[in-house]
Amino acid sequence: MLVLGIETSCDETGVGLVEGGRTLLANAVASQVEVHARYGGVVPEVASRQHVLALVPTLHRALQEAGVSLPQVDAVAVTCGPGLVGSLIVGVNFAKGLAMALGKPLLGVNHLEGHIYAAWLEPTLDPEREPGFPLVCLLASGGHTDLVLMEGHGEYRLLGRTRDDAAGEAFDKAARVLGLGFPGGPEIQREAGRATRPEPFPRVVVEGLAFSFSGLKTALVRRAQAAGLYPPAGASASPSESREAVANLAAGFQEAVVEALVEKTLEGVRRTGARGILLGGGVSANALLRQRLQQRSPVPLLVPCPSLCTDNGAMIAAAAFFRLRRGERHGWDLDAHPSLRLG
């Protein structure tokens, strides 16, 4: 079954083509990073308009990359939530029109479920074997930080989520405080690599399997102020002092966020007896997070390649395949659900 997946939940326009839920044929993505960088973050109205402009060209790129034509597509899948409501509406309406014109089945997909199934597209995963269920899934991005138990295809139980900022959002805010660019995750990681004496941050203590990053953000602001780095207009540190202080603060902040994510994930494994850990979402591209989980996980670790960690249409197509195989379909009344949950 050849599934075409469409992703427009935030600021990436993605169209992917996946055969049989496992074979990646195309993964075309139009990024809006440069558009939103001037604002220091994603502007919802701007994102929606950019999706309108990018969807048709991105669809054409995906079809060309896969070497297929639209009539060969067996089903159309689209992210219907969670996400920015305007961006979701653009994608959902485009998918409905496309499926209707082609006379093909339509399926709405949870964006977070898509991040889980990005791991099914990893070439190193044995195509003849399923990962061992249950899996503890850490889904960390700019909009979400959830710990979910996947007990089988389409079977999820929420173990914990962030009480305030998402991990990716925390990185974005930290980068802004330190005068770095957008998106913050790659910028923080790059600066952390230059650190000579990483600044220690307090350990995040939250009951259960929930997360919290607002305290770390406050600690960063105070330390940046003490170092004469923040607010930028009143910065008093010399250029050389600033560069060293920024790198050390970035390294300490990254260490604290990663440690919180790793500790809760491993605790989730201990509590549930899970047979594996799955990492998904934009933050899963962080090299330190991958390294720490690989070093400390007592069970197999499933991690998509970096290009599949960020938002894309291929992961939506992969997730849709397993639901379509069970006979699931949506009608033409499919709508956007910006607060949709998983588990």
What feature does the model see in each segment?
Residues 115-117, 305-342:
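Glycine-rich phosphate-binding/hydrolytic loop that grips phosphoryl groups
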Residues 2-82, 93, 111, 115, ...:
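N-terminal beta-alpha supersecondary unit
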Residues 13-18, 137-139, 145-149:
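Short beta-strand scaffold segments in enzyme catalytic cores
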